[in-house]
């Protein structure tokens, strides 16, 4: 077990699931929970602590009331934000959650300027941008969990097409966390073979569509919520890479500085994760078609950022 402390701000379905996995798997020494509803964080801390009595975990989990309590966290996960409500426009949701994330980042900056920040709040790419712009944090220390989840969903749909065989599936998805994401077919393999060697074009096209709609499908089925197990596990993979300084490659939302031909825009791209957060952005040689799709994805994120610049930061 790492002698590390992880803070989770926002203890809804994703935050509480994440805390449960961290605690019961002995991934860190301490977990701090904070929610706008204090009773929620207290309840989750108690419930998870009691569940741990049936495990070999020694992790301590604590509900926090004060932002100062996060001063010693090595990693802070931000899941705070509201879901879109009936009659609420996407612009209203964007501004509302930007206010929440900016407020959280202001508190973190005052109390812990050294932690690695992982954003899960939606709209993801815009919230990563908000966190960066509203704080004095180094760019490599703020990243978003998105592409890792999208890649996991793509892997699932490939396995589904193949009948769930015991094979090694690797996938890569770049771009914004939404309908404009770009699943990279040429960089996705099954036991080292390219997808078009094991699946038909029709099957691959279907996988791309299902990957883009993966989150929406779950929202539709749940009716009053969204996915939380897969997002939590994707975040766990990122946390372990940072805590253990593995230098493994993950698709994460980060701010670009000339990579792929774009600057000062947040998008999901392959990165090397280690103890310092985003240690390197990997530029893949993508096709002209994928470049066009990536450009469309970037423009979609830019639209949201322009709304923030004109109605929130201005």
Curated annotation (Swiss-Prot):
* Disulfide links within the chain: none
| Record field: catalytic activity | (S)-malate + NAD(+) = oxaloacetate + NADH + H(+)
Q: Which GO terms describe its cellular component?
A: cytoplasm
- Has UniProt tagged this entry with the keyword Ion transport? no
Q: Where is the active site?
A: 177
GO BP field: carboxylic acid metabolic process; tricarboxylic acid cycle
Q: Which UniProt keywords apply?
A: NAD, Oxidoreductase, Tricarboxylic acid cycle
InterPro entries documented for this protein: L-lactate/malate_DH, Lactate/malate_DH_C, Lactate/malate_DH_N, Lactate_DH/Glyco_Ohase_4_C, Malate_DH_type3, NAD(P)-bd_dom_sf
Q: Which GO terms describe its molecular function?
A: L-malate dehydrogenase (NAD+) activity
For binding NAD(+), which residues are annotated in this chain's numbering? 9-15, 97, 120-122
Supply the EC number(s).
1.1.1.37
SUPFAM superfamilies recorded = LDH C-terminal domain-like (SSF56327), NAD(P)-binding Rossmann-fold domains (SSF51735)
Q: Does the keyword Oxidoreductase apply?
A: yes
- List ligand-binding residues for substrate: 84, 90, 122, 153
Q: Per its database record, what is this protein's job?
A: Catalyzes the reversible oxidation of malate to oxaloacetate.
In terms of PANTHER family, this protein maps to: MALATE AND LACTATE DEHYDROGENASE, MALATE DEHYDROGENASE, MITOCHONDRIAL
Family statement drawn from the similarity comment of this UniProt entry? Belongs to the LDH/MDH superfamily.
The protein's name: Malate dehydrogenase
Its taxonomic path starts at:
Bacteria, Pseudomonadati, Campylobacterota, Epsilonproteobacteria, Campylobacterales
């Amino acid at each position: 077990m790492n002698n590390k402390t992880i803070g989770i701000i926002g203890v809804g379905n994703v935050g509480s699931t994440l805390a449960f996995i961290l605690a019961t798997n002995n991934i860190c020494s301490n977990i701090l929970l904070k929610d706008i509803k204090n009773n929620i964080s207290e309840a989750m801390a108690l419930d998870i602590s009691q569940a741990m009595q049936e495990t070999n975990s020694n992790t301590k989990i604590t509900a926090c009331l004060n932002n100062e309590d996060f001063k010693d966290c090595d990693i802070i996960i931000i899941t705070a934000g509201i879901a879109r409500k009936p009659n609420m426009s996407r612009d209203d949701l964007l501004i509302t959650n930007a206010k929440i994330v900016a407020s959280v980042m202001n508190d973190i900056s005052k109390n812990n300027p050294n932690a690695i920040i992982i954003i899960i709040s939606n709209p993801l790419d815009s919230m990563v941008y908000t966190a960066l712009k509203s704080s004095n944090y180094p760019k490599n220390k703020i990243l978003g969990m998105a592409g890792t989840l999208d890649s996991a969903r793509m892997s699932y749909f490939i396995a589904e097409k193949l009948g769930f065989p015991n094979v090694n599936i690797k996938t890569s998805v770049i771009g914004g966390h939404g309908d404009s994401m770009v699943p990279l077919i040429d960089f996705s393999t099954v036991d080292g073979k390219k997808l078009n060697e094991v699946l038909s074009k029709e099957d691959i096209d279907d996988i791309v569509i299902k990957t883009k709609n993966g989150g929406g499908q779950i929202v539709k089925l749940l009716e009053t919520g969204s996915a939380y197990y897969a997002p939590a596990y994707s975040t766990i993979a990122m946390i372990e890479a940072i805590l253990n300084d593995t230098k493994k490659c993950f698709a994460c939302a980060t701010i670009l500085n000339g990579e792929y031909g774009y600057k000062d825009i947040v998008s999901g791209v392959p990165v090397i994760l280690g103890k310092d957060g985003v240690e390197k952005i990997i530029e893949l040689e993508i096709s002209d078609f994928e470049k066009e799709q990536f450009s469309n994805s970037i423009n979609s994120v830019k639209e949201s950022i322009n709304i923030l610049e004109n109605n929130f930061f201005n």
